[in-house]
């Protein structure tokens, strides 16, 4: 069990940035998403301060699919990050959060006409082209509007990032982008470059998520730059922007071995600079897109324990008042987490429990084989590292209301997303 910066133990109770879990339950109830605001800000600054170059401009985008709400986007914007958006809703949220939309990059493999029109309306700065159909539609919409927009082409490097199959994105048969080994890509690039309303500036690449091997990132840089050099030589173009995506691995359990982030970012930029020189490129900007690595460890989910049960087969369960509706990642990926009884932090962890949710679903598990003190009804159980792809992937399965989100900082807390009510559950029903 790992306590992150900002987590302390006071009289046997877990505090997050100076706020006790019992106080959080009393004020907001459970289940509850809790984020350490200082940790969010520090992660933003780690990326901004260490991914820097004297040879070209650098830009850090927040991949908002990890966790999107007005307040987290306000923080990212204040800290100088751009934003990666993938839907009408993410564009709208960033816009309403006050983002400079010129710093927004619109991704996705199936952008709709409505989404593209809205993106242009609010001034999204860059659109990332994913496929032929999308390219034709973007060109048509931009031409009709009389606007111009910067575009990147998403490419696949074929790099095998050693991660879960569902979050690999650079395989040759991935649904995203174009393979750099497909000869047809050169004709496409030439055609895009000839469009007067599309300002073709470069390429986007992303090899996957939750990657712990530095060499995967470094190899991808080399492949992208080698391809960029070929494009420039064959087509007589100058490529000015490379977006290298994200995928930086984070800690969930002791099985994970994330690299030290600041050190990696400095090493990463050195590799980018060196390979750019090796291939004779004249880049003006290099972009990265962290999401999970910005928010994951800053967030936790606080639950109340209901029942405790030992089965005939000997498995002991702790039942909590949330589950797969607020965290579907175990059901999707068999994702692993750490749990703690946050009101019994000084007691011996001498019992092995399976932490299960309240959904009417046999797969509604949160943590398998968690070592905890003896659990009782009314205990507070905290699952850590839920700050990415929990709130954003949550659902109303079993007609459960979505959870509130609270930010804590220096001994105080504030509500940033209201929890849903029963009336919210039927608001759209007819």
Enumerate the language-model features and the residues they cover.
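Short beta-strand segments
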Residues: 63, 150-156, 204-206, 243-245, ...
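Short clusters of hydrophobic/aromatic residues that line enzyme substrate/ligand-binding pockets
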Residues: 7, 14, 176-178, 355, ...
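A charged N-terminal "starter" segment
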Residues: 1-150, 186, 190, 194-199, ...
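Active-site-proximal loop/turn and secondary-structure-junction residues that shape catalytic pockets
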Residues: 66-68, 89-90, 110-112, 131-133, ...
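Active-site loop/helix belt of alpha/beta enzymes
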Residues: 2-3, 158-304, 409
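Short acidic, glycine/serine/threonine-rich loops at helix termini
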Residues: 73, 96, 116-121, 138-141, ...
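Acidic, His- and aromatic-enriched active-site or binding-groove loops in soluble protein domains
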Residues: 154, 174-183, 309-317
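Charged (often Lys/Glu-rich) extended helix/loop segments that serve as interaction or gating elements
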Residues: 273, 281-430
